[in-house]
Amino acid sequence: MKRKKLVIGSILMGMTLSLSACGSSDNIVTTKSGSISESDFNKKLKENYGKQNLSEMVVEKVLHDKYKVTDEEVTKQLEELKDKMGDNFNTYMESNGVKNEDQLKEKLKLTFAFEKAIKATVTEKDIKDHYKPKLQVSHILVKDEKTAKEIKEKLNSGEDFAALAKQYSEDPGSKEKGGELSEFGPGMMVKEFEDAAYKLEVGQLSEPVKSSFGYHIIKLTDKKELKPYEEEKENIRKELEQQRIQDPQFHQQVTRDLLKNADIKVSDKDLKDTFKELEK
């Protein structure tokens, strides 16, 4: 079982600050320099954390309403977590900011609900768009286009790809392996690299491809056999779900979409513009 992340992006932090300005004048701290009342304390909390905490509470409310998580699911996950962590279970809870199993169950429940929200975004079109064979490639990565073109000329004149990769490549993970990368499928590489790789035939070299890492020269060494769509459909769905679950930017988009569709109305004047960003 993979270790569940208990924090899904900054907007779902497990903060439990009380924001109720109850108007009490009871002091919660006294010093030689003066005292701090409960109402002053709550006012300060509201000023500093009110909007963030309100956002989190609304997201939790929407998630639990739209994506039901059963007690059985949570209990099963908790027991698996206990088995995995063993004697380190209590340390694990402390490191994740929870004091007891009930709090942990609530966090697991929220995590499950958010994962269900993410999984629901995978459509039939997404699956069909990713129905492509997995590729095996080697590449040479350099910082500038001039060097990339010079290396391509050497390759065109018959020089060995692996030898040039060991000499020039600035990718530490593949350099000593002659530029060889692990097998990959759709959505696993930066777009520019992936698009170029899927256009190649086995044995073919790409022109220099610019990405955020630099300039790549790609060699397609193998294209795996593609199984029938119906056999691969569920595997592709699961891969897409896991990619999105692990993508913080996708978390933000899902959260934004949940809030935009929640018909939120804020009556508190101090928190009125909490969801103003959703209007853009």
From Swiss-Prot:
Organism lineage: Bacteria, Bacillati, Bacillota, Bacilli, Bacillales
Gene, per the UniProt record: prsA4
GO molecular function, one term: peptidyl-prolyl cis-trans isomerase activity
UniProt catalytic activity: [protein]-peptidylproline (omega=180) = [protein]-peptidylproline (omega=0)
Lipid-substituted positions (N-palmitoyl cysteine): 22
Record's bilayer topology term: Lipid-anchor
Subcellular location: Cell membrane
EC number: 5.2.1.8
GO cellular component: plasma membrane
Protein name: Foldase protein PrsA 4
Broadest EC class assigned to this enzyme: isomerase
